[in-house]
Every structure is written in C-alpha cells, then in structure tokens.
Regions:
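Divalent metal-dependent catalytic cores for phosphoryl transfer on phosphate-bearing substrates
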Residues: 3-106
Length: 106
C-alpha cells in the first residue's frame, strides 16, 4: 500500500510463500532411530527449495508461490525474483544471519 500503483504486491502470494518457503525441509531431513536428525536420501540429492517447489506444484499451489519457494535461498541468486520473492529471500537471509551470530557460527 505504501508504494501504490508503482509497485504491486500480491499479499496472498507473499504470505503463502513466507509460510511455505521451507516446506521442503520436511522431506530433506529425517529422524534416525536414536532421535537425531540427518539428511534423507532425497535431501542428499535435492535441497529444500527444489523439493518444496515440487510439493507446491504437486498440491496445486499457484506457480507464483512455487516460484517463491524455489528461489528463496541461494539457488535463486542470479535469477529474476518476483517482488514477493525478494521480500521472502531478504527476510530469510536476515533470520539466517541472526541465528548464525546467535549460535556463534561466524
């Protein structure tokens, strides 16, 4: 609303993409018998942006939402992101960098 007619955002796509951008992690990782988490066989071959995009398409979500999921991480760097995709990417990176600093990974 702040940018008016010059810069349109689809709030439904933005919200859906923000909520579902990491949905692929549900199948990228699995629990071991001792309760630890490890990469699944699928996760060793496909990172969560790709598996998440496939899940979105499989379940009939709009291609615009699948685009946000597919391009929210480093795999989307250098590609044309939708305005909603740019917002989700930047928020995800801010969150990731904050978590890295919090746990002392830098």
């Amino acid at each position: 609303e702040v940018y008016g007619e010059k810069f349109k955002l689809n709030k439904d796509y933005l919200l859906a993409g923000a909520l579902l951008h990491d949905v692929g992690k549900l199948i990228e990782y699995e629990k071991t018998a001792d309760g630890k988490t490890q990469k699944s066989q699928l996760g060793k071959n496909l990172r969560h942006p790709f598996s998440g995009c496939a899940l979105a398409v499989k379940h009939g979500l709009p291609v615009e939402v699948a685009h946000i999921i597919a391009n929210h991480a480093k795999e989307g760097d250098g590609t044309m992101r939708s305005p909603e995709g740019v917002i989700v990417n930047k928020c995800d990176m801010l969150n990731f960098e904050g978590l890295k600093a919090f746990v002392g990974m830098i």
